[in-house]
């Protein structure tokens, strides 16, 4: 193992992989470390991503596309379904990936670009000098070592331990940490071309339940509920088990995962001296959908681009790295995150009766676009009083 690099990347998910590939292609010496023994496992994601968004970063490949989705459905507590076909659903209809293969492909591309990839290596603490991050102390297959770098990109997922140890505030309020559970199920009867989202406080309080098909009568069936709603007998797994017993009584569960997804605002600042934070660690998960693959790839790539310029200029201070933070906040992604956070804060206050009323009002509508923005516009069109309740969003809905 070498001990000095231009850029050290912590985490082998989509954010880390795109950062490593981009940084290596720019001519930097790059090391990507991953704490697990294998890239892409365990899968901690529903595995969905919009088609156009994916194509911004990688050419789709049948090897890691489990299903090509034709429509999306939102199903209210009383069963009213809002169905969006592919020609109107835009970026929300897309692919269901096989993350085990997809993540490995991304890291493989980073390695081909010249990045060193080291698995079973955990960053235990930042190397700090005069208040700046200068690398990481690691345990590699149980052996301690130091890896020094001009810039560290922390892409270590929801836990965001490295950024916290470097002094950034990464705490997520309990109510904004979704408690999630997911089963990979087979031998179930589903619409193989539709991603389904179920709403309702009896189904998934302050969250939603999803069914994402993966072909051959197989699907990811999962749920996310507010952390403050999770308690004995009412955990995410309990709600999921009840849904499965009712809807897929003869299905077979071949894999189960559990975890948390932050649906808060992004970190107040995603840079420090010698440090950048990307992906889920930066809290750039969509607050409504909980999706984060595309945002992770975007922030990982952007972090590497800015880091490369700073290294070339010989200045990796917080001030020099700040264009990364400013650019993603000013981007379409940053705008959507802020708007969707406000929408999420409103919708978690609704009871099932209000959810049913809103769904029924647009169930037969022909939406011009299927996105959170398109959905809110149509809801306001059908329910004008809603604009008063969403007055904080007025300027973003034009």
From Swiss-Prot:
A 2,3-bis-O-(geranylgeranyl)-sn-glycerol 1-phospholipid binds at residue 372. Keywords: FAD, Flavoprotein, Lipid biosynthesis, Lipid metabolism, Oxidoreductase, Phospholipid biosynthesis, Phospholipid metabolism. Is involved in the reduction of 2,3-digeranylgeranylglycerophospholipids (unsaturated archaeols) into 2,3-diphytanylglycerophospholipids (saturated archaeols) in the biosynthesis of archaeal membrane lipids. Catalyzes the formation of archaetidic acid (2,3-di-O-phytanyl-sn-glyceryl phosphate) from 2,3-di-O-geranylgeranylglyceryl phosphate (DGGGP) via the hydrogenation of each double bond of the isoprenoid chains. Its EC number is 1.3.7.11. FAD binds at residues 15, 34, 45-46, 48, 99, 123, 280, 292-293. One of its GO terms (biological process) is membrane lipid biosynthetic process. This is Digeranylgeranylglycerophospholipid reductase. It catalyses: a 2,3-bis-O-phytanyl-sn-glycerol 1-phospholipid + 8 oxidized 2[4Fe-4S]-[ferredoxin] = a 2,3-bis-O-(geranylgeranyl)-sn-glycerol 1-phospholipid + 8 reduced 2[4Fe-4S]-[ferredoxin] + 16 H(+); 2,3-bis-O-(phytanyl)-sn-glycerol 1-phosphate + 8 oxidized 2[4Fe-4S]-[ferredoxin] = 2,3-bis-O-(geranylgeranyl)-sn-glycerol 1-phosphate + 8 reduced 2[4Fe-4S]-[ferredoxin] + 16 H(+); a 2,3-bis-O-phytanyl-sn-glycerol 1-phospholipid + 8 A = a 2,3-bis-O-(geranylgeranyl)-sn-glycerol 1-phospholipid + 8 AH2; CDP-2,3-bis-O-(geranylgeranyl)-sn-glycerol + 8 AH2 = CDP-2,3-bis-O-(phytanyl)-sn-glycerol + 8 A. InterPro entries: DGGGPL_reductase, FAD/NAD-bd_sf, Geranylgeranyl_Rdtase_fam, Geranylgeranyl_reductase, GGR_cat.
């Amino acid at each position: 193992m070498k001990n000095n690099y231009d850029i050290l990347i912590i985490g082998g998910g989509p954010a880390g992989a795109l950062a490593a590939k981009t940084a290596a292609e720019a001519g930097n010496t790059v090391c990507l470390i991953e704490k697990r023994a294998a890239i892409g496992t365990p899968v901690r994601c529903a595995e969905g991503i919009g088609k156009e968004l994916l194509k911004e970063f990688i050419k789709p490949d049948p090897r890691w596309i489990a299903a090509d989705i034709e429509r999306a459905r939102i199903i209210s507590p009383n069963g009213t379904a809002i169905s969006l076909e592919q020609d109107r659903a835009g970026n929300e209809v897309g692919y269901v990936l096989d993350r085990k293969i997809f993540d490995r492909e991304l890291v493989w591309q980073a390695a081909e670009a010249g990045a060193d990839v080291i698995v079973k290596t955990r960053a235990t603490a930042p190397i700090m000098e005069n208040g700046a991050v200068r690398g990481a102390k690691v345990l590699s297959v149980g052996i301690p070592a130091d890896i020094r770098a001009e810039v560290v990109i922390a892409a270590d997922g929801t836990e965001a331990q490295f950024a916290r140890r470097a002094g950034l505030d990464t705490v997520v309020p309990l109510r904004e940490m979704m408690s999630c559970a997911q089963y990979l199920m087979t031998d179930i009867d589903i619409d193989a071309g539709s991603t389904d989202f179920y709403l309702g406080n009896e189904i998934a309080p302050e969250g939603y339940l999803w069914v994402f098909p993966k072909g051959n009568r197989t699907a990811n069936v999962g749920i996310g509920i507010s952390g403050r709603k999770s308690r004995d007998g009412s955990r995410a797994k309990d709600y999921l088990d009840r849904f499965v017993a009712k809807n897929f009584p003869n299905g077979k569960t071949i894999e189960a995962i559990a975890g948390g997804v932050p649906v808060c605002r992004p970190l107040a600042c995603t840079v420090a001296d010698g440090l950048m934070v990307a992906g889920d660690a930066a809290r750039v998960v969509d607050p409504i959908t909980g999706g984060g693959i595309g945002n992770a790839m975007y922030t990982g790539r952007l972090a590497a681009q800015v880091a490369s310029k700073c290294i070339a200029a010989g200045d990796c201070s917080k001030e020099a790295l700040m264009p990364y933070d400013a650019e993603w906040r000013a981007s379409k992604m940053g705008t959507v995150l802020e708007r969707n956070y406000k929408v999420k804060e409103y919708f978690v206050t609704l009871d099932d009766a209000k959810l049913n009323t809103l769904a029924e009002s647009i169930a037969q509508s022909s939406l011009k676009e299927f996105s959170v923005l398109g959905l809110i516009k149509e809801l306001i069109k059908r329910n004008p009083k809603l604009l008063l309740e969403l007055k904080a969003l007025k300027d973003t809905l034009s």
